[in-house]
Amino acid sequence: MEKDKHSHFYNQKSDFRIEHSMLEELENKLINSRKTERAKIQQQLAKIHNNVKKLQHQLKDVKPTPDFVEKLREMMEEIENAINTFKEEQRLIYEELIKEEKTTNNELSAISRKIDTWALGNSETEKAFRAISSKVPVDKVTPSTLPEEVLDFEKFLQQTGGRQGGWDDYDHQNFVKVRNKHKGKPTFMEEVLEHLPGKTQDEVQQHEKWYQKFLALEERKKESIQSWKTKKQQKREEIFKLNEKANNTPMLFHNKPEDNQKQKEEQRKKQKLAVEAWKKQKSIEMSMKYASHLKEEEEKEKKRQKERQRQFKLKLLLESYTQQKKEQEEFLRLEKEKREKAEKAEKRKTAADGISRFQERDLHKLELKILDRQAKEDEKAQKQRRLAKLKEKVENNVSRDPSRLYKPTKGWEERTKKIGPTGSGPLLHIPHRAIPTWRQGIQRRV
């Protein structure tokens, strides 16, 4: 498809080279716009990627200091803000593109319906015209037999493009429907432009002027036909009276031979004039009957076309409902995916916050542990310094005497100063418990 498009665009011998040049210029603008937008997005993503790389590099060499932790927190907040800003910008762009896509689809649907209506209208109108032409001969209608108002109305229709004023039936019906809805007030212009995307405001204003003139001429035509019917009825009564008088006149003078020839000639002239008036009236009646027949056929064809359009609109309505249902299902699916993505993102954010919180806690514990170890090392070093100072104060001037190892110690000498009985004599008395007086003299049973 891209190849066919370029073959039309760059074909110098094409009949639509000017239109293709305009499309080519528009396409180049859109391509440049897409390139600029792509470069901007790549720049934003590269910036976020670099910040993430810096954060990863900082996490490889963790320092248990409050300044380092604060720096990591600032870097994470900066990355999070950049990602949220990027997502919000893209969301707004996508929403705008979706609105433009819906508007374009509505315009394409309206144009497609219009083309289908043209196809149906042209074929059916041609069939109806052939049927009417075969039923009634054309030479029966002459401009001289029709009233002036009818001729003006028909001439106006021929000069301005028929009963739709040169518009197709779909656009004209929408125009009339909206105009009747607002009862002809000027406020209906804006709504007409919404229903007819292919028409400009000047075209709608010109069609409104034409339609006002059309209604005025049609009203004059109806009044003229009504007046013609009244006159026809009056002439019919006059002709009937003349015929009745002509039939009764010979009977009145039948028995009078003295009637002269002059009266007979006058009577014949009156009869001839009455017959000519009757023929002319018949011709006018046939012309009006044919015009009425044409109008009836036109009304029937219009009803048939309205019925076809109604069925076609029902079909389009069904298709639109089906399409709308599919779009709604797709929208719900996308909303579900979006909601799931948001939940996952929220979970990831919660996990990231938890990891960050745990990392901060671990860093705090590590910092406390390092501080405790440092305090113990400082205390130990201080103790060593204190002992060294004490050693420096004490003087050791003891001479070496190996023979003192064989001498008794002071403690031993103190023990040997007082020596008690050795206990080597015979054991003559063994102490026993005293015997109560009331048991003395009682022998012990064995």
Swiss-Prot record:
Residues 247-277, 394-430 are annotated as: Disordered. Transmembrane segments: none annotated. It comes from the Eukaryota. Residues 23-116, 219-400 form a coiled coil. The keyword Coiled coil applies. Its main location: cytoplasm. Residues 255-268 have a biased composition (Basic and acidic residues). InterPro entries: CCDC148/CCDC112. Keywords: Coiled coil, Cytoplasm, Cytoskeleton. It is found in: Cytoplasm, Cytoskeleton, Microtubule organizing center, Centrosome, Centriolar satellite. The keyword Cytoplasm applies. GO terms for cellular component: centriolar satellite; cytoplasm. This is Coiled-coil domain-containing protein 112. It comes from Macaca fascicularis. The lineage of its organism: Eukaryota, Metazoa, Chordata, Craniata, Vertebrata.
